[in-house]
């Protein structure tokens, strides 16, 4: 399966979220969300657009393993074939009976992986296995506001952007294609911003 980065549900000029879209099968998708909820919004879009889809929140818990030695730790856990997992691609794995989705993504601007646990009852077991595998590499728990993410210019929803921010203010112009034939939510609002210009822009110091 493959992943793509989204600006996340731009509505009336505002960013509601900045998720990663995972494609698990031809018609099976996950939105890996930032620090906000879009479940009811997505359900409302589906109903009002007449889409024949089922939208639900799965029993999935994400955990990230990031850093220059993350691949060596992943090899200890999953074997050598994990080295072949390309950036923004995913695979299904079983780790001693624990069902997982592993993607070559992360929130650190470093080599890293996201591990999606598909059975919440196995959370402690998974965590301990990862910490044991990473002990010789000095593995430590971290969080989304680590300095590596900030230095890499990776934005965190709520910390760096919110519902009052538009993509052009964040320098996300490269992710917006206003010339595409397909319509999408927020397209007209984004066209207007593009024509009028912005009054502020976020920069890193």
Placement of each model-derived feature along the sequence:
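Conserved, structured C-terminal
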Residues: 22-205
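Short loop/turn motifs at secondary-structure junctions and domain boundaries
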Residues: 12-13, 96
